[in-house]
Amino acid sequence: MRYLTAGESHGPGLTTIIEGLPAGMPLLAEDVNKELKRRQGGHGRGARMRIEKDQVQITAGIRHGKTLGAPVAMFVENKDWKHWETVMSIEPVPEKNEKSRRVSRPRPGHADLVGGMKYGHNDMRNVLERSSARETTVRVAAGAVAKKLLHELGIEVAGHVLEIGGTRANLTRDYAVREIQETSEASPVRCLDGVAAEEMMQKIDDAKKNGDTIGGIVEVVVGGVPAGLGSYVQWDKKLDAKIARAIVSINAFKGAEFGVGFEAARKPGSEVMDEILWSKEDGYTRRTNNLGGFEGGMTNGMPIVVRGVMKPIPTLYKPLQSVDIDSKETFNASVERSDSCAVPAASVVAEAVVAWEVAVAVLEKFDGDRFDTLKKHVEEHRNLTKEF
């Protein structure tokens, strides 16, 4: 299973095409729209979220609420397009209009300058329109489809915010996936710790007042995962590696860790490895989950626990120093409409990309042509691993 996305931030809209879904899987537009709505929420979002009310148009691959086994095409309209029709026109426009909203002062930390160098664009708008996090709209749409597939197989995905601007949630226990879903949805910053959430919101407000931005850390937990997804036999078959790649592919994300993550470097092996248990009711389990649900690049039946770190958004309302590519003189960088903090929304994007990789791994391991046989094979596998 794979997908491609297309579209610019201020173009007519964004498109994704998914290939490889099994036939007969239940899927409605509402399954996607509820995830799009979640992405648009969160304390710290900018003015654009008051303009865009994202709704998906499914244009291919579904009939009467079920997948056909053919490619699924989805489109999300950009409501703000009407204000950008000339600037972002597909057809040629007069030269004076062509230079309208031209960007010649790249923003530090963004794709602007290097993208312009790479593709020969003397207007960095050609770069920023595609590199914008607006593209994550259709990544969330694709992830919503993956989450639906996993849900039907008894696999659930939840994300939450661990840290914003140096304020970290004080979590003294593990949370079940359902509990994470319910608690994070009730928080304006998707944080499980109400006290920390208040401090996070204050830091976001302070950053906005100062024309600045702040980043943070999100965590995604996947429960009900069968053992044996991914493989140890080749480096590029390891599922944790694929998930790590997916996490750092999200705009502004700079790292990923599983389980205790980098803390493992500071502990002896006896405090890191998860002891193996067995019972007739549950089969093989682990006493702890320090490795985040992975051993040898494969799922071990414990919940997947992965975290991603997001840098502050590079668009600042008090811009940093840059250089004009025409005159080579020093100026302040260009300013584009942006958020002061998008960490809560990014947790939804992280859910989507993790769900996608897990769904792909499921389809790689089990028959993916028909959804009814897929469900049967997953259940048979659960029983086999329990009896091993």
Swiss-Prot record:
Q: Which residues bind NADP(+)?
A: R39, R45
Looking at the record, which segments are called Disordered?
95-118
Tell me the GO BP annotations in alphabetical order.
Answer: amino acid biosynthetic process; aromatic amino acid family biosynthetic process; chorismate biosynthetic process
Q: Where are the transmembrane segments?
A: none
Q: Which cofactors does it use? A: FMNH2
Enumerate the UniProt keywords alphabetically.
Answer: Amino-acid biosynthesis, Aromatic amino acid biosynthesis, FAD, Flavoprotein, FMN, Lyase, NADP
Return the Pfam families for the record: Chorismate_synt
Q: Which GO terms describe its molecular function?
A: chorismate synthase activity; FMN binding
The annotation note on the cofactor reads:
Reduced FMN (FMNH(2)).
User: Which residues does the annotation say bind FMN?
Assistant: R130, S131, S132, N251, A252, G296, K311, P312, I313, P314, T315, R337
Q: Does Transport count among this protein's keywords?
A: no
Q: In which pathway does it act?
A: Metabolic intermediate biosynthesis; chorismate biosynthesis; chorismate from D-erythrose 4-phosphate and phosphoenolpyruvate: step 7/7
What is this enzyme's EC?
4.2.3.5
Recorded hits in InterPro entries, A to Z, give:
Chorismate_synth, Chorismate_synth_AroC_sf, Chorismate_synthase_CS
Which enzyme type, at the first EC level? lyase
Q: What GO CC terms are in its UniProt record?
A: cytosol
Catalytically driven reaction(s)? 5-O-(1-carboxyvinyl)-3-phosphoshikimate = chorismate + phosphate
On assembly, the entry states: Homotetramer.
Q: Which family does it belong to?
A: Belongs to the chorismate synthase family.
Q: What does this protein do?
A: This reaction introduces a second double bond into the aromatic ring system.
NCBIfam families associated with the record: aroC, PRK05382.1
Q: What protein is this chain from?
A: Chorismate synthase
> What gene makes this protein?
aroC
